[in-house]
C-alpha cells in the first residue's frame, strides 16, 4: 500500500514502482493499493501490475477497507507491506486484519511521517500500534530509526533507497561543457527544503562567479515566494525554474549539473529522513552540498562525496559552493567518489531489505522464500 503513483513519480511513489518492478522480475506476484485524494475506486494495470486506486478520505474509509480486504483474499496474498501510511487509520486497520488472518506484514517509516504523527492528539497511539502489530519495521535511515518511540518486536531494518544505475551510462560526464557552472536544486518547493537560502547564497555567489547558473527543479506552495525572491535579488535569467520533472528530462538536468545543493532545514514536524536526490546526483558524478540535519549525513559523506554545512547558514553555504566551483579538481574528485558510492545503492538490494523485514530468506535457487507459511503461524 502506498500513495497514488499517478500523482507524482518522485519520493515514495517512485519507490513503490521500483520495488514492484524488482519483485515482479523475481517472479513474485504483486498488487498495489494506492491511496489518493479522489473519492472513487478504480482499477488499472501499471507496468504489468494490478494497481487499485482507493480514496484516502475518512468518509470513504469503510469502502476503502472493504476493497483492501477483497484484494488480499481474492488473490490469496500472504504478505502486506505498507510502503507509506503505516500510522494512518487505514494502515493500522490493515495491519490488524493481517495479524488476525496470519499474513505477514511490514511497514516503512521515513522520518517526516514519525514527526508529523506526533502533532495529532492520538499521535503516540498511532505510532505505537504499527510497531506492535507489524512483523517487520523498516526505516529509510539510521537517523529515522532513532526517531522510533520504542523498539518494535523485531529489530528494525534499515532500507536505504536505490538508484537506476543503468541510466547514468547514457549521460557520460566526458561530454559535459566543463566551462559552464550549473548549480542544481531538486526537491519540493516547501520551506523545509531551503530553496530560499540557496537563492540568497547564489545571489552573493554571482558577484564573484557571474557565469554561474542555477536550475531549480520542483513544484510546491513556495513557488510564488521563490519567484519573488529571485526577482528581488535581480537574478534574471541566471535562475531557471523548471517545475517538476521526471524521467529522461530530469536525468538530462542532472547530467548537465556541476553541483547539487539542497540546504534543508529541520522543523519540529518535518525533516529530511535521507535524501535520495543526493544519490541520484552522485549517479551522474555530481557532488553535493547538504546540511547537517536529519539523515543527510548518511547520504552525503562530508569531504568524500560532497560537503556538509550547518542549516540556515548562508555564509557557510556560499563558502562551500564557491570553494568547489573554484576548484575543478576537487569537484571532479568528489564527483567520482559520489558516483562510486551511488552505484552501491541498487533497487535490487533495497528490495532485499524489504523482503528481509517481511521475514523472507534466500533459498538455494537464489530466490526469496517465506520460511513460515500461514499454516505454521
Predicted regions: what they are:
Residues 175-193, 199-202, 206, 260:
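Conserved donor-binding/catalytic core segment of Leloir-type glycosyltransferases
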Residues 227-248, 259:
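Nucleotide-activated donor-binding/catalytic signature segment of Leloir-type glycosyltransferases, i.e.
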Residues 143, 162:
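Carbohydrate-associated surface elements
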Residues 79-101:
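An aromatic- and histidine-rich active-site surface loop
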Residues 238, 255-270, 286:
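Acidic donor-binding loop of glycosyltransferase active sites
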Residues 4-5, 88-89, 103-121, 136:
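A short, histidine- and acid-enriched strand-loop-helix "catalytic/donor-clamping" loop
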Residues 278, 283, 287-290, 300:
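Short hydrophobic beta-strand element within catalytic cores of glycosyltransferases
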Residues 302-303, 307-314, 322-329, 343:
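Conserved acidic donor-binding segment of nucleotide-sugar-dependent glycosyltransferases
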Amino acid at each position: 500500500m502506498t500513495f497514488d503513483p499517478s500523482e507524482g513519480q518522485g519520493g515514495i511513489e517512485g519507490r513503490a514502482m521500483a520495488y514492484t518492478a524488482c519483485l515482479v522480475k523475481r517472479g513474485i506476484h504483486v498488487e498495489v493499493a494506492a491511496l489518493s485524494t479522489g473519492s472513487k475506486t478504480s482499477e488499472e494495470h501499471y507496468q504489468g501490475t494490478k494497481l487499485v486506486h482507493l480514496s484516502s478520505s475518512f468518509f470513504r474509509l469503510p469502502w476503502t477497507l472493504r476493497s483492501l480486504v477483497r484484494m488480499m483474499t481474492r488473490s490469496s496474498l500472504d504478505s502486506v507491506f505498507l510502503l507509506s501510511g503505516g500510522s494512518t487509520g487505514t494502515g493500522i486497520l490493515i495491519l490488524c486484519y493481517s495479524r488476525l488472518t496470519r499474513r505477514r506484514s511490514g511497514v516503512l517509516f521515513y522520518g517526516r511521517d514519525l514527526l508529523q504523527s506526533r502533532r495529532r492528539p492520538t499521535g503516540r497511539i498511532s505510532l505505537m500500534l504499527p510497531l506492535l502489530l507489524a512483523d517487520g519495521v523498516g526505516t529509510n535511515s539510521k537517523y529515522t530509526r532513532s526517531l522510533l518511540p520504542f523498539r518494535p518486536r523485531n529489530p528494525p531494518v534499515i532500507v536505504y533507497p536505490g538508484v537506476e544505475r543503468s541510466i547514468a551510462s547514457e549521460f557520460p560526464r566526458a561530454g559535459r561543457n566543463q566551462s559552464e557552472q550549473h548549480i542544481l536544486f531538486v526537491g519540493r518547493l516547501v520551506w523545509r527544503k531551503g530553496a530560499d537560502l540557496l537563492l540568497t547564497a547564489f545571489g552573493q555567489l554571482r558577484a564573484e562567479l557571474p557565469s554561474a547558473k542555477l536550475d531549480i527543479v520542483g513544484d510546491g506552495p513556495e513557488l510564488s515566494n521563490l519567484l519573488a525572491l529571485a526577482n528581488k535579488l535581480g537574478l534574471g535569467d541566471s535562475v531557471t525554474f523548471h517545475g517538476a520533472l521526471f524521467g529522461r528530462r530530469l536525468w538530462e538536468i542532472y547530467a548537465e549539473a556541476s553541483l547539487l545543493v539542497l540546504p534543508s532545514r529541520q522543523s519540529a514536524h518535518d525533516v529530511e529522513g535521507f535524501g535520495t536526490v543526493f544519490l541520484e546526483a552522485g549517479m551522474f558524478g555530481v557532488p553535493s552540498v547538504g546540511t547537517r540535519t536529519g539523515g543527510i549525513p548518511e547520504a552525503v559523506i562530508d569531504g568524500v562525496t560532497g560537503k556538509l554545512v550547518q542549516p540556515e547558514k548562508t555564509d557557510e553555504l556560499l563558502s562551500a559552493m564557491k570553494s568547489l566551483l573554484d576548484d575543478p579538481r576537487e569537484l571532479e574528485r568528489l564527483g567520482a567518489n559520489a558516483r562510486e558510492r551511488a552505484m552501491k545503492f541498487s533497487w535490487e538490494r533495497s528490495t532485499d531489505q524489504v523482503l528481509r523485514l517481511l521475514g523472507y530468506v534466500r533459498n538455494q535457487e537464489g530466490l526469496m522464500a517465506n520460511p513460515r507459511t500461514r499454516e505454521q503461524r
